A protein has these predicted regions:
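Extracytosolic ligand-binding ectodomains
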Residues: 1-195
Length: 195
């Protein structure tokens, strides 16, 4: 899960988190934006609770890396026959001076409409555009090409992040079994949680 609470106050004993949380994803984006010197952010937030949580992670990362959110707007539009992304997005994003547009839309309800449609041509990051993810099909190091090709041959599609998480879980258990020289659950569990 991406929920930060599951790694903090609600963290359970005996749980191993394999995929990045919202805070980790936001920090990764902030670090890259800092490297590119894109320090002024325009934040667009959706209406769902998940969007609010991702926006909070983005704000935390911006503060942590000394980046500035110069504008924040809530997206309340829906696209129907009378309204189009071509018309709404440029108007929504004009009037602000920013380096990058940050979208918080975890369910993908509107974020895809922002790429190449902003008033000023700016990169889009966050939950759409440039995203922080544990896995991407273009990853080529550490045997990733072979893993990707084998997965595609068996599943008939490219590996996604959730698939990679499942692979990591199986790989961790297998590695613990080999290194502990045991197939007993308590021994494997103890190995996984040892320092």
């Amino acid at each position: 899960t991406s929920d930060d609470e599951n790694r903090n106050g609600q963290c359970r004993h005996g749980v191993v988190h394999l995929l990045p949380s919202r805070a980790m994803r936001a920090d990764a984006l902030a670090q890259y934006m800092l490297k590119k010197r894109w320090q002024k952010w325009f934040l667009v937030v959706g209406q769902t609770q998940e969007d609010q949580l991702f926006a909070a992670a983005i704000k935390r990362a911006a503060k942590r890396f000394n980046l500035k959110i110069v504008a924040e707007k809530n997206w309340t539009n829906d696209f129907d026959a009378r309204r189009t992304a071509q018309a709404d997005v440029p108007v929504f994003t004009q009037g602000e001076d920013y380096d990058v547009l940050v979208v918080a839309d975890e369910q993908g309800l509107f974020g895809e409409y922002f790429d190449y449609r902003t008033w000023s041509p700016r990169p889009v990051i966050g939950t759409q555009g440039l995203i922080a993810t544990a896995w991407h099909p273009s990853h080529e190091q550490w045997g990733a090409v072979q893993l990707q090709n084998r997965f595609k041959d068996q599943a008939g599609r490219w590996m996604q992040e959730v698939d990679y998480g499942a692979y990591l879980a199986v790989r961790a258990i297998g590695e613990a079994s080999v290194r502990s020289k045991s197939n007993q659950v308590p021994v494997i569990r103890d190995y996984l949680f040892s320092s």
